[in-house]
């Protein structure tokens, strides 16, 4: 006898499994939205109009309305298929055959001709040699003998400066490290010798100096430097305060006062601290 629970399992086995949905590139990255046209308008849309309708009316951003549930249409039309985005280089428009076949040489553009300036120095020199002095004679001479300054004459070819035969171009290479001098402490020995020579020169310079004898002070030199002492006057006090004693005397005698000061100094350490109970270091 078949189990009554098996028919339910058999029915579920006949159900087809859902295949995974593969999206195309156009679905993942849809093409850019183009501006609306009259053909795209259907009944019930927001941009449906009555009367004469032209495509240019749907390219005006002030007139076009946003459709329900869709992004707003832009009225900017895209260029055609043959349009290249970016910089177009005309020198490389032939591709690989043109690059391999010949060199791309740009022709020099012809310079625009300009009027040459007059050479007044040469014309004045010629007029003086011809004996012309007045302004009218000079003007007529310049009309007959119009001398111009050539641009090629101003461009003097400067010769390069003479280069010495032992000239080295570029950065000179670092000389090789003298390992033998480093191992022998040659630089240390040279430094010690220089220090000794410097000390010897200082000693010789001190010996060459004339050592003067001790100068003794005489009575005349002492009188020359003597300054008489200035007697300072005592400070002035008011006469009726001279013999006034202290107003308050708490000690009967001076001995008692000194004894109290001594006891105060002995108790000075005990009366220190935040609570005036002394400073002590507890173990």
Curated annotation (Swiss-Prot):
Its main location: cytoplasm. It comes from the Eukaryota. One of its GO terms (biological process) is flagellated sperm motility. Residues 151-170 are annotated as: Disordered. GO terms for cellular component: axonemal B tubule inner sheath; sperm flagellum. Keywords: Cell projection, Cilium, Cytoplasm, Cytoskeleton, Flagellum. It is found in: Cytoplasm, Cytoskeleton, Cilium axoneme; Cytoplasm, Cytoskeleton, Flagellum axoneme. Pfam families: CFAP77 (PF14825). Microtubule inner protein component of sperm flagellar doublet microtubules. Belongs to the CFAP77 family. Microtubule inner protein (MIP) part of the dynein-decorated doublet microtubules (DMTs) in cilia axoneme, which is required for motile cilia beating. This is Cilia- and flagella-associated protein 77. It comes from Mus musculus.
């Amino acid at each position: 006898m078949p189990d009554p629970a098996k028919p339910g399992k058999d029915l579920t086995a006949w159900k087809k499994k859902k295949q995974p949905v593969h999206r195309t590139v156009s679905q993942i990255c849809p093409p850019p939205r183009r501006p609306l046209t009259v053909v795209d308008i259907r009944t019930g849309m927001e941009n449906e109009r009555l009367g004469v309708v032209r495509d240019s009316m749907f390219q005006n951003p002030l007139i076009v309305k946003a459709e329900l549930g869709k992004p707003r249409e832009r009225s900017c039309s895209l260029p055609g298929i043959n349009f290249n985005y970016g910089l177009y280089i005309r020198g490389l428009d032939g591709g690989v055959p043109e690059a391999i076949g010949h060199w791309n040489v740009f022709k020099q553009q012809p310079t625009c001709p300009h009027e040459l300036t007059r050479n007044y120095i040469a014309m004045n020199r010629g007029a003086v040699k011809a004996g012309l002095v007045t302004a009218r004679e000079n003007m007529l001479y310049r009309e007959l003998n119009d001398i111009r300054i050539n641009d090629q004459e101003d461009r003097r070819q400067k010769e390069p400066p003479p280069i010495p035969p032992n000239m080295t171009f570029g950065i000179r290479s670092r000389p090789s490290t003298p390992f033998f001098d480093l191992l022998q402490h040659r630089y240390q020995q040279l430094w010690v010798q220089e220090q000794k020579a410097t000390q010897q020169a200082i000693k010789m310079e001190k010996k060459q100096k004339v050592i003067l004898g001790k100068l003794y002070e005489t009575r005349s030199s002492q009188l020359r430097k003597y300054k008489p002492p200035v007697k300072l006057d005592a400070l002035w006090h008011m006469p009726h305060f001279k013999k006034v004693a202290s107003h308050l005397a708490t000690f009967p005698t001076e001995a008692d006062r000194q004894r109290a000061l001594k006891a105060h100094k002995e108790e000075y350490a005990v009366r220190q601290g935040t609570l005036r109970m002394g400073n002590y270091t507890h173990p």
